[in-house]
Amino acid sequence: MRRMRFSPRSSFARTLLLIVTLLFVSLVTTYLVVLNFAILPSLQQFNKVLAYEVRMLMTDKLQLEDGTQLVVPPAFRREIYRELGISLYTNEAAEEAGLRWAQHYEFLSHQMAQQLGGPTEVRVEVNKSSPVVWLKTWLSPNIWVRVPLTEIHQGDFSPLFRYTLAIMLLAIGGAWLFIRIQNRPLVDLEHAALQVGKGIIPPPLREYGASEVRSVTRAFNHMAAGVKQLADDRTLLMAGVSHDLRTPLTRIRLATEMMGEEDGYLAESINKDIEECNAIIEQFIDYLRTGQEMPMEMADLNSVLGEVIAAESGYEREINTALQAGSIQVKMHPLSIKRAVANMVVNAARYGNCWIKVSSGTESHRAWFQVEDDGPGIKPEQRKHLFQPFVRGDSARSTSGTGLGLAIVQRIIDNHNGMLEIGTSERGGLSIRAWLPVPVARVQGTTKEA
């Protein structure tokens, strides 16, 4: 059987737990110190004084310091009873007077027995006003002595409890606020690191907090600046290469237009190659631009899918739809999602047999859209590499393409905090489903097929 262990993972929870534990240990230690060095000695002194009073009340003669004995008159004894509030009860009367609700304390009985020199039973009755001590000694085994502690009130402990609770809450609240302030730079750093992972370079972070955190933030800013410079250099290089490639391609196209009619088939073949080269260059540029920050807005996913379906449908291509009826409002960059859907449809058209199905829906706080084809599919062990740049399945080796179409889709969906799933379509081909986060309150309608 697996053992369950409580182990907080975040530094916030660990630090707060450590402070609360230290505070609890400090309170327990303080309690033990006060108990052993203040309360117990006072209690022993109280027992000693109480024992003197009981001995004086239970005996007829008192021994003074010089050794002489003094006879205690009954009137003097009664006056002491009245001043101290002490009452004497038989066993039956004591039960009726509250002894039945009193609790026996062994350590008090033991200490009182030592003071009185014989067996003694001590009980404490706790009532609403003040506690009462009941004693029965060997000096008068049939009599219970009732001693009210009128100077001690139940309400006296309430301020102590409230002050202790207030101190604990203030300490925990202060610790929580301190840790939150200390961890705020780390939260900003985490958010910025996630953006860099998506290809979005945030502005330099403000360096604040502890010296170690400032050092990490400074190093992260240097790293982000280096990554941004590298991305800018790559984009500039690709733009220059594409410009330099398009110039000779344009000259080649002009040369084909000046070719004679007898070379028309050759000119047509050259023009197709030129168009393919231009398409490859455009895909390279699209891939580089995909990682840039995109402004998000609330848009209808079904409307975006409908625009792509209308643009990609043709007499040689059958696109079936199973879109959820109504509106699916998603926070997105519509142009990027449109590009992702178009790439998925083009991929299905290229490797399928003219059957494509586009569907959409919602499930568990998420919206999804899916593109299926009836092609040969792809082996399960190759699916995890399908969205990597320049990677294509075995069935696509003989077809044209750069292998960047689905890589662009992956980057777009990642920038929307979504995810991609690969499966098998209803006709045995490839199925690609994209999930996007969406509030449940913005989902309406049911699925309808066309």
From Swiss-Prot:
Residues 1-15, 180-450 are cytoplasmic. GO terms for cellular component: plasma membrane. It is a multi-pass membrane protein. It catalyses: ATP + protein L-histidine = ADP + protein N-phospho-L-histidine. It is an enzyme of class 2 (transferase). Residues 240-440 form the Histidine kinase domain. Residues 36-158 are periplasmic. Homodimer. Has several major domains; the N-terminal cytoplasmic domain is followed by 2 transmembrane helices that anchor the protein in the membrane; the periplasmic domain between the helices interacts with MrzA. The cytoplasmic C-terminal domain has a HAMP domain joined by a flexible linker to a histidine kinase domain. The HAMP domain by itself is intrinsically disordered. The cytoplasmic dimerization domain (CDD) forms an osmosensitive core and includes the autophosphorylated histidine residue. This is Sensor histidine kinase EnvZ. The gene is envZ.
